[in-house]
Amino acid sequence: GYDFGEGDIHANFAAMYKVDYAKAKELTFKQLYGGVFDNYKDLPFFKLTSEYIRTNWEKYNAEGKLICPISNYEFKRDELENMNPQKLFNYVLQNLETSVNIEILYRIFGVLKGKNTKLVLYTYDSFLFDVDDSEKEVLEQIKEVFNKLKLQIKSKHGHNYDFK
């Protein structure tokens, strides 16, 4: 895998691309889901990404299936139409994201068991909690869930969904 270090992943991409943070985030998602742009194909991260896509495609064709990391879900060649290397990578990427999120949710529900604090909304990569005033320590326990999985987080708080 590629080591981004301790900093924010999109800030690292911004430095690689020599663009601002928002543009870096946009460029990264476009390339992960649509294919690596020629002007970035020599960056170490995208070299590794391209190699991962190529080896998965070869394995998929040779074995007739590809087994996803974490979930062990099998994408079977005889069940999927119009497959290509990038599309297969997208399927694997989304499966991996879902698998990681299930692990996060499982651990968070363990932290919240018996507590008044509740997870009230989960979308994609965001989690909204209604934190009981007497349970502020729960937030640190939730942060620890992400730390143990080596995931970076950003947090905001407020009295309503607008964080005011």
Positions of predicted regions on the chain:
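Conserved catalytic core of nucleic-acid polymerases
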Residues: 8-122, 149-151
